[in-house]
């Protein structure tokens, strides 16, 4: 009910502004654009965005994507979580699931010597927050897919004193 009463209050405030704008235009005889109308439409669009439409049945959208059929039917997608960068200790890049496609034929461009391909999906990498979202997207587009499960590293229990032990390789003299 709060959204409805807010809308009514906004309508009354904007209607008052519109009447004042119309009166000002009629007095000055200069055509100016009424801003209150666009503000009212903006307020209505914001209320429409909050109402989501959910479709329970699975839709096949392969015919309307614009991708040639040979790239849809024979396409294999790989769904995975990227590995941590070995040069850094952070794991921020390993939170999202990624989908990439198999490599198709490439050739060397005779003019510039660059690697060329006729595959529109070759350099496409999609990012998803969950594995289920990635699988649903692949099924919706009609692609076959392989899922590589996330590899969770086992924490190694070490003591700080192990860094200074004399019988380990860490304390071998370099002289």
Swiss-Prot record:
Topology in the lipid bilayer: Peripheral membrane protein
Post-translational modifications: Phosphorylated.
Region entry Disordered, spans: 149-175
Transit peptide, from-to: 1-42
PTM annotation (Phosphoserine): residues: 173
Protein function: Accessory subunit of the mitochondrial membrane respiratory chain NADH dehydrogenase (Complex I), that is believed not to be involved in catalysis. Complex I functions in the transfer of electrons from NADH to the respiratory chain. The immediate electron acceptor for the enzyme is believed to be ubiquinone.
Name by which UniProt lists this protein: NADH dehydrogenase [ubiquinone] iron-sulfur protein 4, mitochondrial
